[in-house]
């Protein structure tokens, strides 16, 4: 309970953002999850004029959490659902990561990224995690690029090639 209280005190007059909040309750209460939620619910009441709490996470799991505690549910005034990114938006995020890290993609790699992100969206799998999926793809790309460069006399150390781009199966285990 003290950790929750300390965290709330740090967030007073601001926002407490709880990512993957549903992990406090996975259908069964853990001692920590139940105590944390009870403490947080009380703090939300005690500091209602000084604290905004955002519970973020997958919609269904977050609804379970909120519905598991009537006191919590009654203190949540607004609910927002954000749509998943499109394949084109995911591809733009990927390219931004590439550029921010000082790399370039050749044309074939860019086309492969567009295709990969479109394929991922078509899976309709909310567990892909949007930005997390892109980050995972980018990290695999960099690992593959490093392996390609290490095994050759390549002098271009900043261009991502088609062979560096992971396939969907590598990222999801699905075909």
Question: Model-flagged regions — what are they?
Answer:
Residues 80, 84-86, 94-156:
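Conserved AAA+ ATPase small/helical "lid" subdomain
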Residues 18-19:
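Hydrophobic residues in beta-strands of the RecA-like P-loop NTPase core, especially within AAA+ ATPase
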Residues 15:
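Hydrophobic "anchor" residues on beta-strands that sit immediately upstream
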Residues 22-60, 67-73:
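Conserved catalytic/switch belt of AAA+ P-loop NTPases
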Residues 144-175:
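C-terminal engagement/docking regions of AAA+ P-loop ATPases
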Residues 2, 34-38, 74, 92, ...:
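Surface-exposed alpha-helical interface segments used for non-catalytic interactions
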Residues 66-84:
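A short helix-turn-beta junction within AAA+ P-loop NTPase domains corresponding to the substrate/partner-engaging
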Residues 1-12:
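Short glycine-rich substrate-engagement loop in P-loop NTPases that contacts/grips substrate
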């Amino acid at each position: 309970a003290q950790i929750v209280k300390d965290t709330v005190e740090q967030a007073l007059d601001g926002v407490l953002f709880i990512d993957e909040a549903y992990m406090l309750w996975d259908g069964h209460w853990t001692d920590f999850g139940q105590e944390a939620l009870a403490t947080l619910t009380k703090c939300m009441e005690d500091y209602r004029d000084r604290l905004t709490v955002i519970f973020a996470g997958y919609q269904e799991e977050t609804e379970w959490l909120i519905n598991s505690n009537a006191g919590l549910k009654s203190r949540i005034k607004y609910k927002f659902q954000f749509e998943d990114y499109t394949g084109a938006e995911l591809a733009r995020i990927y390219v931004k990561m590439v550029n921010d890290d000082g790399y370039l993609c050749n044309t074939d790699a860019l086309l492969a990224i567009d295709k990969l992100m479109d394929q991922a969206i078509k899976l309709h799998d909310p567990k892909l995690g949007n930005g997390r999926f892109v980050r995972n793809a980018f990290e695999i790309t960099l690992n593959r690029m490093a392996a390609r460069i290490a095994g050759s006399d390549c002098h271009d150390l900043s261009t991502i090639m088609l062979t560096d781009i992971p396939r969907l199966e590598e990222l999801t285990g699905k075909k």
